[in-house]
Amino acid sequence: MAAATFVEKFRGTEFVHASVYGSWWFVGLWAVLALLAVAYFVGRRVRRASVVLLHLSFAVILAGALLTHVTSWQGAVRLRVGETVSTYYENVPGGDVVERKLPFELRLESFDVKYHDGTRAEADYVSRFTITDGGATQRAEVSMNNVWKYRSVRFYQSSYDPDMRGSILALNSDPWGIPVTYAGYALLFLSLVWLLVDPKGAFRRLFKSDMMRRGVLSVMAVCAMSQAAGAANTLPRETADRLGRLNILYNDRVCPLQTFAVDFTKKLCGSARYGDYTPEQVLAGFIFYGDEWSAEPIIRVKNGPLRDALQLPGRCSVNTFFNQVMGGYILGPYLNEYYHGHNDKFHKQVADIDDRLMMVMELRRGTLLRVFPFTSGGKTTWYSPTENITDTLVDEAHRKYMQNVFSLIYGEVLAGSYGNVDKILDKMLKYQQLNGGSSLPSAAQVKAERIYNAIPFATILFMVNLTLGVVLLIIGLIRLIRPVKTDKPDRPDKALLRAVPVVGGALLGLSLLALTACIALRWIVGGRVPMANGYETMLLLAWFVMVLALVAARRFRIALPFGFLMSGFFLLVSHINQMDPQITHIMPVLSSPLLSVHVSVIMMSFALLSLTFICGLTAIILRLVRGRNAVELDGQLDSLALLSRLLLYPALALLGVGIFVGAIWANVSWGAYWSWDAKEVWGLITLMVYAVAAHAASVPFLRRSMGYHIFMTLAFLTLVMTYFGVNYFLGGMHSYA
């Protein structure tokens, strides 16, 4: 399966589905695996009900998948308003599409795209149609995450025509596979819960071990670059702050202008501040003092072939790229090559710089400043000061205000009358409040977003957590390697070591509170659970790691450095440039409570599995440092293995539940509970690999603590591939890099 995901990358989805996932030999492999499991159960005489039920659930799921493979069909029907259709197009093996007859007729009555108020961001797609079967007619309606079922056929909203007069519905008929598969999911959930609470199960037996009773796991105590900005003119800080309090339509979302200023500054210079200037002052500088700021070396140019070829400094101005001696826009010829297929690193850097320069040009033209709302008939539209307003509903007074107010501000700025500028900006805010309708964010959302913009939570927390994690881990390792002698109870270093876990726990708690505030602010601002993109899932994963570390630290002090390190790592990943922290409306298909459950459960599982990785890594380091014959080493390795296994069982349960909740969501959203997407495949691989560790009784290598730790350390690579490899290399439906 792993190889198939790489083949798909280079040969395409249709090829790998026809040659691997849909082939007879692949189905046969699953059948052989199921038969071997049955033979093993019979041979070992496994009778514990929870274990039997768990493996039975997998057999039922495989049976459901087989029924779906053999008996189901999928297709699509294209509808136009007022036209009757009685055929659909079915996908057949080999990638062909065949037109087939429907057992009833369909007629599209209407199709609507619903938008978030005041924006062009789609909130939902709704198709209303009638089904005529013989002499009976019934009305039906489908939208994203709202399926209509008639007889054995399920209808899903798939796409629509550009003229808004047509809709494409996906069809799926799977009367046998879905109920059997869902029954398997239900059995899986029950069996996983049963395994965790079964007094005779492996998980509960871990709590009865001698090491738990003796507390052996307590052997460990705990385990923006400054810029030389010039003195370019801009608005005073207080006036610029007033500018930032205005609302703007940005990224298909109405938000404080401060948010746009922060993103504008980040994109230009790589950080939220430029020298002593606030983001609002940087934005105001380019708006009102464009010539001065075009000469300011604010644009960050990374090391690479572009800097080498053009002999550019690390910080350039806008004017640097416009040189009459060199023919005007010096990036022009290279940009033309980029759009003709030259996608090497040099030309990608050219495109990146051009993107930032065009942003500055559009700002100076005023097209980015959509700060003037007008509401008519319950619909709100936001305009920029230079926009050609063709809407006849906008009266002349509003039109003149929109077109002239920035010129008025510019005149006051040139005169240095910043008090008058403040008054104009206050009136603009009142204008927005009077004309913005329901598109305006609430006062709570505005306050939350301004706080969120002012505090770089992820940046601060990743540095703090990684630093504290390294310090605490070093202290713990030193104590393991050079234990404190107990014959001198009054030694000051012993008292210090006793205080370390208390202080570490308090600091981790403070870090958790700060991250909770960060997530809560994003939740308030976005009006949705913040788990829809890579940045947000990294925050959530770090949050779960810290919660688990604090809970586990009451018994296992080693959990503290583990919690700091892993949460710091996840926050570092969220901080890097590859992830975009902007808050936006999510796609309609993602507006489902099942998605929230799916992501949160998976993230909890990943958090637990990441801690098992740290356990394994620590064990390997101890073995390398202390050697094979060190006194007490075996006991320490056993203690780490016990902690790792205590984390493993709930992690597997959560991963299994998360995967199959995701399958149910997929079936509700687009009619296929399993599509062999790269993320699905690697999620299944991760589950199967970690499940091997739960079968230590059948694998001699895993019975030894060191062997177990080596396996768990290597198993973490599957998790890394599931999250990062798919997002940044393989791609697919689940890629949100």
Regions found by a protein language model. Name each.
Residues M1-A737:
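Solvent-exposed, non-transmembrane regions of integral membrane proteins
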